[in-house]
Amino acid sequence: MRYVLLGPPGAGKGTQAALLSEKLGVPHISTGDLFRANIGEGTPLGLEAKSYIDAGKLVPTDVTARMVEDRLNQDDAKDGFLLDGFPRTVQQADILEKLLSDKDLKLDGVLNFEVSEDVVVERMLARGRADDTEETIRTRLGVYREETFPLIEHYGDAIISIKAEGTVEEINERTLQAMGK
């Protein structure tokens, strides 16, 4: 079971991935968590990632791809994963496809969490992260629209659309139904 989770920042991807991971027994691999771990440990990749995150910009593909590849190579991800935050661009999607095809693997689907911009801003301000100022949120939404939205076209029929408004439980139930679980 290998899924990518798409949607704007604040769409609830991380929340849903954590619930799905627990229910389905596959790891939730979040680039945000990978970045925070590397930043917290002061690794060179982490320090580089921090400068971009603090500015509300996407971390460069080579940095992110190396973190993701290392994580996908860990034992708990061999039978599946829920990938949250990568790919964000068509270039990254091609990198992921190659990483998987090198192991004779492919994605089972792409969960696209759809939510209004007003709900995104409200949710992100409420969670109180240091990197979530209103200016940073709006910058990230602009970057998402410009760079990430083309993934929906790229993935085409693999896209599974999820209405990501309502309670956490309602969204989780919709997601499990859409996955056929």
UniProtKB/Swiss-Prot annotation:
UniProt region (LID), positions on chain: 126-132
InterPro entries with a match to the protein in the record: Adenylat/UMP-CMP_kin, Adenylat_kinase_CS, P-loop_NTPase
Catalyses which reaction(s): AMP + ATP = 2 ADP
Protein name (Swiss-Prot/TrEMBL): Adenylate kinase
UniProt pathway: Purine metabolism; AMP biosynthesis via salvage pathway; AMP from ADP: step 1/1
Top-rank EC class of the record's enzyme: transferase
Residues binding ATP: G10, A11, G12, K13, G14, T15, R127, G166
Cysteine disulfide links: none
Family: Belongs to the adenylate kinase family.
Record keywords: ATP-binding, Cytoplasm, Kinase, Nucleotide biosynthesis, Nucleotide-binding, Transferase
Functional summary from the UniProt entry: Catalyzes the reversible transfer of the terminal phosphate group between ATP and AMP. Plays an important role in cellular energy homeostasis and in adenine nucleotide metabolism.
Principal subcellular localisation of the protein: cytoplasm
GO MF entry, a single one: adenylate kinase activity
Pfam families per the UniProt record, alphabetical: ADK
PROSITE patterns documented for this protein: ADENYLATE_KINASE
